[in-house]
Amino acid sequence: MCIRDSDKPEERADYYKRIKDLEREGDKLTHLILDELGTTFITPFDREDIHALASTMDDVIDGINSCAKRINIYNPRPISDSGKELSRLIQQEAVYIGKAMDELETFRQKPAALRGYCNKLHDIENQADDVYEHFITKLFEEEKDCIELIKIKEIMHELEKTTDVAEQVGKILKNLIIKYA
């Protein structure tokens, strides 16, 4: 959102504040889940799996927040189409993670839908790798301002890492399918 919707510093600051607020809400939910794990006798699946899933989903939100923070602090030139594409891919991953969560109640009886969302997360992460590699090659060939190069490279690297973490959510979910289906 911070990348795709604005190249103006004041709007970036507003987006960053909104993203930071959402990240804090995510932290609260993660802590609530982890606290409940310690007091709940029966869980829908292993505590370790719930812990891994909640923590990794929180890491996705943390990655998005980290990207927005870097954009706000570094104030780079307008983000390239590659940055906007990585942002779009992260948004797609978030949608598929949400859809995957909706499948958790029934995945033991019908694992195909959950498996499909996990595969989508993997495919999107592969697309993100391609976008990132192409962008980095072009950045080092074309960018002459060393400071700008460092700022943009850090932001793009953080975006790409966030797609990796979202894929990890899919891997955790696939392990649940294997374990329980």
Regions found by a protein language model. Give the residues of each.
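Conserved small/polar residues in nucleotide/adenosyl-binding loops
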Residues: M1-D5
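Heptad-repeat coiled-coil alpha-helices
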Residues: K8, D35, T39-I42, I73, ...
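Hydrophobic/aromatic-rich structural module bridging two neighboring secondary-structure elements via a short loop
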Residues: R12-L22, L29-D62
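Short, charged, amphipathic alpha-helical segments
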Residues: A13-D21, R47, H51, D81-K84, ...
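Internal glycine-rich alpha/beta core junctions
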Residues: L22-E25, I124
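Long amphipathic alpha-helical coiled-coil segments
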Residues: F41-D49, Y74-R88, E141-I152, N175-A181
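Charged, well-structured binding/catalytic surfaces in domain cores that contact anionic ligands
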Residues: T56-K138
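Long amphipathic all-alpha helical oligomerization modules
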Residues: Q109-A181
